[in-house]
């Protein structure tokens, strides 16, 4: 009888431990939906979320937009590969998230149109005013969307057991892409477009604002 209890206890311990990596990933993904950066940071072994800043996700100017986008994300854990001896696991999540490609393209086109209009009128905005205008247009374009467009992806998170519990090893690029609705940085694309306009002006070309059509592929990498 005692042997049965020992075996039963060992099995129970194993299944309990097996669920911990899964719960860690679920906690991380739930905090993504809520834009709870403190919890996200606590669930990352390196505690490094700087990639979110590179995508402007933690910029206060865009909080409303990204909060609205990320709360619509859903997920389902589809696989949990667990190694109790090494204290490691690989947890796969199937994630459905907002694809903001058309929102960004419409925002960039409208923003550049207004910038050119202000330039012709002799109005020069400060950096703060420019960012506020961009954030406002982004929110306006998001509200105009009649039906949300979703994308799906599978991410396998490497998870490791630490002294303070199970942690995801590091923040990956795909997760950042999800949180930013499929783009790395709208500000970077704006800067690239403005630089292109400056080059056109210096070469004597037309200074009309370029349009981002529905078929364009915007490259937001440096």
Predicted regions and their residues:
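Juxtamembrane cytosolic interface motif at the C-terminal end of transmembrane helices
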Residues: 10-17
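Short solvent-exposed beta->alpha transition segments
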Residues: 41-124, 138
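Hydrophobic membrane-insertion alpha-helices, especially the h-region
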Residues: 1-10
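Short, aromatic-enriched amphipathic alpha-helices that serve as compact interaction elements
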Residues: 17-36, 193
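Solvent-exposed, acidic/flexible segments
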Residues: 18-21, 33, 55-59, 148-152
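Extracellular, surface-exposed passenger/stalk and repeat segments of large secreted bacterial proteins
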Residues: 31, 35-42, 171, 176-178
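Long, low-complexity, intrinsically disordered segments
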Residues: 207-222
